[in-house]
Amino acid sequence: MSSPAPLWSFGDGLSYTTFEYLNAHYSAELVHPSDTLIVSVSLKNTGSVAGKEVVQLYVRDVVSSVVTPVKQLKAFSKPFLQPGEMQTVVLKLPIQELALYDLSMKKVVEEGEYEIQIGTASDDIRLRRTIFVGRQPVTSNSICHTAFCMHDLVKNPVRKIQVAVCVRDGE
């Protein structure tokens, strides 16, 4: 029987040099569906020879109304760096690219948390940050979903809700 894990992850490859992902700057932590998130990553060639690195931006939808992939590649760049050189790599993510088809088959960008992952391969994530798409982030005193918040139930106690859960293995 074979394992569901791939032999080589997406983005896996060989290099004669090494790279360090030092930090990332995000244009915003709260974005709207019409926005474009800009992520700037500081990349340094820490090896002794020049080389190229594929900097990849993945997105993970933390909570979704429908089943979504564990992570999706949304942007990448392949800079060339000399030994010891540091470069800022800019990746752009139009938030509309997070759209999915909901249960009523409408294409929507759901409000909620999305984890932005920066790495060299799908299984080699170096930097992570959570952003929030929508009007306001989830707070500790309200349990929110795209169409309903718990504080709405307190205002309208006769309202009925249906709760659905999707559990994922892995990340």
Predicted feature residues:
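Secreted, periplasmic, or luminal enzymes acting at the cell surface/secretory milieu
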Residues: M1-K52, Y58-R60, P83, E111, ...
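Intrinsic-disorder/low-complexity, polar/charged segments enriched in Ser/Thr/Lys/Arg/Asp/Glu/Gln
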Residues: T36-I38, M86-V90, R126-R128
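Short, hydrophobic/aromatic beta-strand segments
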Residues: A50-L57, T68-P69, D102-L103
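Intrinsically disordered, low-complexity Pro/Gly/Ser/Thr-rich segments with frequent PxxP/GP/PP motifs
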Residues: S65-Y101
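Compositionally biased low-complexity segments at domain edges in trafficked proteins
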Residues: I143-C166, G170-E171
